Amino acid sequence: MNLKEKLLSDMKEAMKSKDSLKLGTIRSVIAAVKNQEIDLRKDLDEEDVLTIVSREVKKRKEAASLYKKGKRPELEDKEIQEMKILQTYLPEQISEEDLRQRIQEVIEETGAEGMKDFGKIMKTLVPEFKGKADNALIKELASEFLN
């Protein structure tokens, strides 16, 4: 069962169990997938759907932080719950320790020295950890090693 089919079956399950939060969250992702399919005029593959789910998780995370700054805990909680629902569809996230180790390996492999080689490292790391680690975290750790 691919990710798109899993989203559809989980949506049906949420309808049956009357879980309105999960239902609304999954519907928004399915809508984003369909909009992307319409824009590109083709069916999306697994990787594209995964990218959309990652984008939706990132949106929820940003919204939660804005609600926190605005002292709106009830809306922040809702965004966090939606984010947790969506994270179940993402591959298991890599630990920061493993990510640090891999960044160190890539730096040694490419012979990177300083921030001038930052692009080389990111070009290798981002596709490798797509969906498994946040790009902002990869960027932060890579720049930490290069400085």
Where in this protein do the model-derived segments appear?
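Charged, compositionally biased, marginally structured helical/coil segments
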Residues: 1-147
